[in-house]
UniProtKB/Swiss-Prot annotation:
Function per UniProt: Binds to the 23S rRNA.
Complex and partners: Part of the 50S ribosomal subunit.
Xref: SUPFAM superfamilies: Ribosomal proteins L15p and L18e
Keywords of this entry: Ribonucleoprotein, Ribosomal protein, RNA-binding, rRNA-binding
Name of encoding gene: rplO
GO biological process, one term: translation
Species, as recorded: Desulfatibacillum aliphaticivorans
Official protein name in the record: Large ribosomal subunit protein uL15
Entry similarity comment: Belongs to the universal ribosomal protein uL15 family.
Region (Disordered): 1-58
Gene3D superfamilies assigned to the protein according to its UniProt record, in alphabetical order: 3.100.10.10
An annotated Gene Ontology molecular function: rRNA binding
Amino acid sequence: MKLNELSPPKGARTARKRKGRGPGSGLGKTAGKGHKGQKARSGGGVRPGFEGGQMPVHRRLPKRGFCNIFAKKIAAVNVRDLARFEADSVVDAAALREARLISGKVDGVKILGHGEITQALTVKADQWSESAKEKIEKAGGKIEAA
């Protein structure tokens, strides 16, 4: 077989539908849009979520809760993610940001206890779970308030 003899298998490539090109094509005259009406017009159609004038579901359902403007955004970092740092290094918010473990604007860092850690690290965080503290101290490291 030569490169110039290559061809796609039958049915792999279908011809595009040429709409509005005469009655013999099967897609002539109205081009599959039916007769008149909003959906037959150029640019016609209803917006997403429109239910024909009936009260839409997003307005039938009640509002709930509120957005607390004083809420603090705390970034969560697991113990297993700290394993990428070298032994005896200081892990603080700046180090976590450099390692791309936290991103964006955060008001604090919380260390959680998922996973294992083997190297001794000095971790500076705003919050931590008891299990995270145990694992860090068991590995020979220490955890301090940032």
